[in-house]
């Protein structure tokens, strides 16, 4: 066959495999023809601890051999020098013990830096005097390199200093989420004042500002209707009571159920849906055991909305006798 030059591969132990003070490094000389090859280490200056194994003829007819050397694990990298006279080839390969370092995740590429979101108070909080409405400003994708975030709050463009201390949360993707909460008065929200959160962070070229206020427009009073379960449902273990709420504006509304003055929790509310006339409607479905409905328990749908008298109304429903 034609003479063929060898390929040379460095051999080094994996990181963590060698707690001992000596480490074995090697070179694999593969796929050459004809014999022989010579292997020296550090141009022949390193002879101590060298073992060069006999060549092996592979099924392809080409030859391979390996040479190893034992060195102290702290020593400099070593070089194997491979010569193949038949093809006039000389190859030098440097082999180094791999150093162990604790693997670290690369920091996520936070392109564009942090983002800011502002959230309105919960409708129930703005409508009940006993509760405190809050506007919330959330900053996400804050990097660990620039973790400091400053919040400045404004009501109708006048700075206020009544925000709670910011809360910081380390996220799983090694970014930080920072939340600032501003307690506000019921009146400031209901009268449509504008709340602004201004966020400073080193990773931002300029501060980010987000504003929020109640939807503008004439408030419209919700109409509330309750409906019992369809007859076909009475054979199931539980039945659905429906509270339909129609014609309200703005869309901020709170809907809950109770039975005998105690809260019922097993309900779901659809989001408020924009109707063709510009008002909103929604449905709320309460699931109750059929037995409670059949024995005549009274269920009450309670609605809170700013256009209602005292911000509150309720509608009750129970099984009428004979059904």
Swiss-Prot record:
Domain of life: Eukaryota
More details: PubMed:6313520 sequence has the D12 allotypic marker, 104-Thr, and the E14 marker, 185-Thr. PubMed:6193512 has the D11 and E15 markers and Ref.5 the E15 marker.
UniProt keyword annotation of Metal-binding present: no
Molecular function terms, GO-annotated: immunoglobulin receptor binding
Chain ranges of the Ig-like domain: 6-96, 114-213, 222-318
SUPFAM superfamilies, per the entry: Immunoglobulin
Keywords noted in UniProt: Immunoglobulin domain, Repeat
The keyword rRNA processing belongs to this UniProt entry's keyword annotation: no
Name under which the protein is recorded: Ig gamma chain C region
């Amino acid at each position: 066959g034609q003479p063929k030059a060898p390929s040379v591969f460095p051999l080094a132990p994996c990181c963590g495999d060698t707690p001992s003070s000596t480490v074995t490094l090697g070179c694999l000389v593969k796929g050459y023809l004809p014999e022989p090859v010579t292997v020296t280490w550090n141009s022949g200056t390193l002879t101590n601890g060298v073992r060069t194994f006999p060549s092996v003829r592979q099924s392809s007819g080409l030859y391979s051999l390996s040479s190893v050397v034992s060195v102290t694990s702290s020593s400099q990298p070593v070089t194997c020098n491979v010569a193949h006279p038949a093809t006039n080839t000389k190859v030098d390969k440097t082999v180094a013990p791999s150093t162990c370092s604790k693997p670290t995740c690369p920091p996520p590429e936070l392109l564009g830096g942090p983002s800011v979101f502002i959230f309105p108070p919960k409708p129930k909080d703005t409508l009940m005097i006993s509760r405190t409405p809050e506007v919330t400003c959330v900053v996400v994708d804050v990097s660990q390199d620039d973790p400091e975030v400053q919040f400045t709050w404004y009501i109708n463009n006048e700075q206020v200093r009544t925000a709670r201390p910011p809360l910081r949360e380390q996220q799983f993707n090694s970014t930080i989420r920072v939340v600032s909460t501003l307690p506000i008065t019921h009146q400031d929200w209901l009268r449509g004042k504008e709340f602004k959160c201004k966020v400073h962070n080193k990773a931002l070229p300029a501060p980010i500002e987000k504003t929020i206020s109640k939807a503008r427009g004439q408030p419209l009073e919700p109409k509330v209707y309750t409906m019992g379960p369809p007859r076909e449902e009475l054979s199931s273990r539980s039945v659905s009571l429906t509270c339909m709420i129609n014609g309200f504006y703005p869309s901020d509304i709170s809907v809950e159920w109770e039975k005998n003055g105690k809260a019922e929790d097993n309900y779901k509310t659809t989001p408020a849906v924009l109707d063709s006339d510009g008002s909103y409607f929604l449905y709320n479905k309460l699931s109750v055991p059929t037995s409670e409905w059949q024995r005549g328990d009274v269920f009450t749908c309670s609605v809170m909305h700013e256009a209602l008298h005292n911000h509150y109304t309720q509608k009750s429903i129970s099984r009428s006798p004979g059904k």
